[in-house]
Amino acid sequence: MSKQRIERVDSLPLIVYWLTKMRIQEAIDAIWQPHPYWQGLSYGQLAVLFVAYVLYTHTHRLCEMEDWLNSHRTLLEKLTGWRIGVKEATDDRIGHMIEIIGCEEEKAIRLQRQVGQNLIQAYALPTEIVRYDTTSFSVYHTVPENGAGQGILGFGHSKDHRADLLQFKQGLGSLDPAGVPLFTNTVGGPCADDPLYLPAWEEMVKTIGHARFLYVADCKAAALLTRATIDHKKGYYFVSLTHDWRNS
Protein backbone atom coordinates (compact mmCIF):
# COMPACT_ATOMS: atom_id res chain seq x y z
CA MET A 1 0.00 0.00 0.00
CA SER A 2 1.45 3.34 -1.02
CA LYS A 3 2.12 5.94 1.64
CA GLN A 4 0.68 9.40 1.43
CA ARG A 5 2.36 12.49 2.79
CA ILE A 6 1.69 16.20 2.76
CA GLU A 7 4.21 18.70 1.40
CA ARG A 8 3.84 22.38 2.22
CA VAL A 9 3.74 24.69 -0.79
CA ASP A 10 4.03 28.14 0.81
CA SER A 11 6.25 30.51 -1.19
CA LEU A 12 8.30 27.85 -3.00
CA PRO A 13 6.57 28.19 -6.41
CA LEU A 14 7.23 31.95 -6.38
CA ILE A 15 10.88 31.52 -5.34
CA VAL A 16 11.59 28.88 -7.98
CA TYR A 17 9.77 30.94 -10.63
CA TRP A 18 11.96 34.00 -10.07
CA LEU A 19 15.17 31.96 -9.90
CA THR A 20 14.18 30.36 -13.20
CA LYS A 21 13.34 33.76 -14.68
CA MET A 22 16.81 35.02 -13.65
CA ARG A 23 18.36 32.02 -15.47
CA ILE A 24 20.62 31.21 -12.53
CA GLN A 25 21.05 27.58 -13.56
CA GLU A 26 22.00 28.38 -17.16
CA ALA A 27 24.48 31.07 -16.09
CA ILE A 28 26.27 28.76 -13.63
CA ASP A 29 26.32 25.71 -15.91
CA ALA A 30 27.77 27.80 -18.74
CA ILE A 31 30.80 28.64 -16.57
CA TRP A 32 31.33 25.57 -14.35
CA GLN A 33 31.13 21.99 -15.61
CA PRO A 34 31.30 19.20 -13.02
CA HIS A 35 33.83 16.38 -13.05
CA PRO A 36 32.95 13.55 -15.49
CA TYR A 37 32.29 11.24 -12.53
CA TRP A 38 29.91 13.72 -10.89
CA GLN A 39 26.40 12.24 -10.80
CA GLY A 40 22.99 13.79 -10.30
CA LEU A 41 22.06 17.44 -10.64
CA SER A 42 24.47 19.96 -12.13
CA TYR A 43 26.10 22.76 -10.15
CA GLY A 44 23.55 25.21 -11.53
CA GLN A 45 20.60 23.05 -10.52
CA LEU A 46 22.02 22.50 -7.02
CA ALA A 47 22.64 26.24 -6.69
CA VAL A 48 19.00 26.99 -7.53
CA LEU A 49 17.83 24.52 -4.87
CA PHE A 50 20.30 25.93 -2.33
CA VAL A 51 19.18 29.53 -2.90
CA ALA A 52 15.55 28.40 -2.64
CA TYR A 53 16.40 26.65 0.64
CA VAL A 54 18.10 29.77 2.05
CA LEU A 55 15.23 32.06 1.05
CA TYR A 56 12.58 29.65 2.32
CA THR A 57 14.14 28.74 5.66
CA HIS A 58 16.13 31.93 6.36
CA THR A 59 19.18 29.86 7.20
CA HIS A 60 22.27 28.68 5.33
CA ARG A 61 23.16 25.65 7.45
CA LEU A 62 24.21 22.94 5.01
CA CYS A 63 23.51 20.07 7.40
CA GLU A 64 19.75 20.76 7.35
CA MET A 65 19.25 21.09 3.60
CA GLU A 66 19.07 17.35 2.86
CA ASP A 67 16.06 16.86 5.15
CA TRP A 68 14.43 20.05 3.85
CA LEU A 69 14.82 18.98 0.23
CA ASN A 70 13.37 15.53 0.86
CA SER A 71 10.38 17.04 2.67
CA HIS A 72 9.62 19.14 -0.45
CA ARG A 73 11.02 16.82 -3.12
CA THR A 74 7.79 16.07 -5.01
CA LEU A 75 6.85 19.74 -5.16
CA LEU A 76 10.33 20.79 -6.31
CA GLU A 77 10.37 18.10 -9.00
CA LYS A 78 7.06 19.41 -10.33
CA LEU A 79 8.28 23.02 -10.25
CA THR A 80 11.65 22.41 -11.89
CA GLY A 81 11.03 19.34 -14.06
CA TRP A 82 14.20 17.74 -12.63
CA ARG A 83 14.56 14.26 -11.20
CA ILE A 84 15.82 14.94 -7.67
CA GLY A 85 17.52 12.06 -5.88
CA VAL A 86 17.26 11.44 -2.15
CA LYS A 87 20.96 12.21 -1.63
CA GLU A 88 21.23 15.21 -3.96
CA ALA A 89 21.59 17.76 -1.18
CA THR A 90 23.97 16.17 1.30
CA ASP A 91 26.16 18.74 3.02
CA ASP A 92 29.31 17.49 1.25
CA ARG A 93 27.74 17.88 -2.23
CA ILE A 94 26.38 21.36 -1.48
CA GLY A 95 29.66 22.35 0.15
CA HIS A 96 31.60 21.15 -2.89
CA MET A 97 29.34 23.14 -5.22
CA ILE A 98 29.77 26.31 -3.15
CA GLU A 99 33.54 25.82 -2.99
CA ILE A 100 33.81 25.37 -6.77
CA ILE A 101 31.73 28.47 -7.51
CA GLY A 102 33.48 30.62 -4.92
CA CYS A 103 37.12 29.65 -5.38
CA GLU A 104 37.78 31.53 -8.64
CA GLU A 105 37.07 35.25 -8.39
CA GLU A 106 37.23 35.85 -12.14
CA LYS A 107 34.54 33.25 -12.86
CA ALA A 108 32.40 34.51 -9.97
CA ILE A 109 32.50 38.02 -11.47
CA ARG A 110 31.51 36.57 -14.86
CA LEU A 111 28.50 34.98 -13.16
CA GLN A 112 27.47 38.28 -11.57
CA ARG A 113 27.82 40.02 -14.92
CA GLN A 114 25.71 37.43 -16.74
CA VAL A 115 22.94 37.41 -14.12
CA GLY A 116 22.91 41.22 -14.05
CA GLN A 117 22.57 41.39 -17.83
CA ASN A 118 19.75 38.83 -17.73
CA LEU A 119 17.87 40.93 -15.16
CA ILE A 120 18.28 44.18 -17.11
CA GLN A 121 17.13 42.60 -20.37
CA ALA A 122 14.27 40.53 -18.94
CA TYR A 123 12.65 43.36 -16.99
CA ALA A 124 13.87 46.40 -18.96
CA LEU A 125 15.31 47.81 -15.73
CA PRO A 126 16.28 51.50 -15.70
CA THR A 127 20.06 51.92 -15.75
CA GLU A 128 20.36 55.71 -15.46
CA ILE A 129 21.56 55.67 -11.82
CA VAL A 130 23.90 53.17 -10.15
CA ARG A 131 25.04 53.25 -6.52
CA TYR A 132 28.06 51.64 -4.89
CA ASP A 133 29.03 51.54 -1.23
CA THR A 134 31.12 49.46 1.12
CA THR A 135 30.77 48.38 4.72
CA SER A 136 32.74 46.29 7.19
CA PHE A 137 31.62 43.28 9.22
CA SER A 138 33.29 42.50 12.54
CA VAL A 139 33.57 38.85 13.57
CA TYR A 140 34.58 36.96 16.68
CA HIS A 141 37.37 34.76 15.35
CA THR A 142 40.83 33.70 16.39
CA VAL A 143 43.71 35.31 14.54
CA PRO A 144 44.83 33.01 11.67
CA GLU A 145 48.09 31.14 12.22
CA ASN A 146 49.67 32.88 9.23
CA GLY A 147 48.76 36.23 10.76
CA ALA A 148 45.97 38.73 10.33
CA GLY A 149 45.86 40.32 6.92
CA GLN A 150 46.94 37.19 5.03
CA GLY A 151 43.37 36.33 4.04
CA ILE A 152 39.91 37.87 4.11
CA LEU A 153 39.85 38.38 7.88
CA GLY A 154 42.11 41.08 9.26
CA PHE A 155 42.31 44.11 11.51
CA GLY A 156 41.36 47.48 10.06
CA HIS A 157 39.45 50.68 10.71
CA SER A 158 36.22 49.52 12.36
CA LYS A 159 32.94 51.38 11.91
CA ASP A 160 31.77 49.46 15.00
CA HIS A 161 34.62 50.96 17.04
CA ARG A 162 35.90 47.46 17.78
CA ALA A 163 39.55 47.58 16.81
CA ASP A 164 40.07 44.34 18.74
CA LEU A 165 37.91 42.29 16.34
CA LEU A 166 38.85 40.84 12.97
CA GLN A 167 36.74 42.04 10.08
CA PHE A 168 36.10 41.74 6.36
CA LYS A 169 34.63 44.27 3.95
CA GLN A 170 31.78 43.96 1.49
CA GLY A 171 30.97 46.21 -1.46
CA LEU A 172 27.62 46.36 -3.27
CA GLY A 173 26.66 48.05 -6.53
CA SER A 174 22.95 48.35 -7.30
CA LEU A 175 20.51 50.00 -9.68
CA ASP A 176 18.37 52.90 -8.51
CA PRO A 177 15.54 53.18 -7.64
CA ALA A 178 14.77 49.45 -7.45
CA GLY A 179 17.91 48.53 -5.50
CA VAL A 180 18.62 45.57 -7.79
CA PRO A 181 22.16 44.31 -7.04
CA LEU A 182 24.52 44.18 -10.02
CA PHE A 183 27.92 43.68 -8.43
CA THR A 184 29.28 42.59 -5.07
CA ASN A 185 32.81 41.99 -3.85
CA THR A 186 34.37 40.76 -0.62
CA VAL A 187 37.79 42.07 0.39
CA GLY A 188 40.10 41.80 3.37
CA GLY A 189 39.52 43.74 6.56
CA PRO A 190 42.68 45.87 6.31
CA CYS A 191 41.84 46.96 2.74
CA ALA A 192 41.15 50.67 2.22
CA ASP A 193 37.80 51.61 0.66
CA ASP A 194 39.08 54.21 -1.82
CA PRO A 195 40.67 51.81 -4.38
CA LEU A 196 37.45 49.74 -4.61
CA TYR A 197 35.23 52.33 -6.29
CA LEU A 198 36.88 52.50 -9.71
CA PRO A 199 37.06 48.70 -10.33
CA ALA A 200 33.42 48.45 -9.20
CA TRP A 201 32.39 51.15 -11.70
CA GLU A 202 34.35 49.43 -14.49
CA GLU A 203 32.67 46.11 -13.74
CA MET A 204 29.20 47.64 -13.78
CA VAL A 205 29.99 49.31 -17.11
CA LYS A 206 30.61 45.81 -18.51
CA THR A 207 27.34 44.54 -17.02
CA ILE A 208 25.20 47.44 -18.26
CA GLY A 209 27.00 47.66 -21.59
CA HIS A 210 27.86 51.36 -21.55
CA ALA A 211 29.16 54.13 -19.25
CA ARG A 212 26.28 56.56 -19.75
CA PHE A 213 24.88 56.29 -16.23
CA LEU A 214 25.22 58.39 -13.08
CA TYR A 215 27.57 56.76 -10.57
CA VAL A 216 26.47 57.73 -7.05
CA ALA A 217 28.90 57.12 -4.20
CA ASP A 218 30.22 58.69 -1.01
CA CYS A 219 33.31 60.85 -0.58
CA LYS A 220 35.65 57.85 -0.78
CA ALA A 221 34.95 57.76 -4.52
CA ALA A 222 36.16 61.35 -4.88
CA ALA A 223 39.80 60.42 -5.46
CA LEU A 224 41.16 62.33 -8.44
CA LEU A 225 42.15 59.14 -10.29
CA THR A 226 38.65 57.69 -9.89
CA ARG A 227 36.88 60.84 -11.08
CA ALA A 228 39.32 61.46 -13.93
CA THR A 229 39.00 57.89 -15.23
CA ILE A 230 35.19 57.98 -15.15
CA ASP A 231 35.19 61.33 -16.96
CA HIS A 232 37.75 60.12 -19.53
CA LYS A 233 35.57 57.09 -20.31
CA LYS A 234 32.49 59.31 -20.84
CA GLY A 235 30.85 58.37 -17.56
CA TYR A 236 29.11 60.54 -14.97
CA TYR A 237 29.56 60.64 -11.22
CA PHE A 238 27.87 62.23 -8.22
CA VAL A 239 30.03 62.17 -5.10
CA SER A 240 30.42 64.37 -2.05
CA LEU A 241 33.77 66.13 -1.84
CA THR A 242 35.62 66.26 1.46
CA HIS A 243 37.59 69.34 2.42
CA ASP A 244 40.79 67.73 1.10
CA TRP A 245 39.34 67.29 -2.40
CA ARG A 246 37.58 70.60 -2.93
CA ASN A 247 40.65 72.16 -4.49
CA SER A 248 41.49 69.18 -6.74
Q: Which positions does each model-derived feature cover?
A:
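Dynamic "connector" segments at or just before major functional cores
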Residues: 1-152, 164, 171-190, 198
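An internal, acidic/charged active-site-proximal segment
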Residues: 192-248
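Short beta-strand-initiation
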Residues: 167-169, 223
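Carboxylate/His-rich catalytic cores and anion/metal-binding grooves
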Residues: 157-161
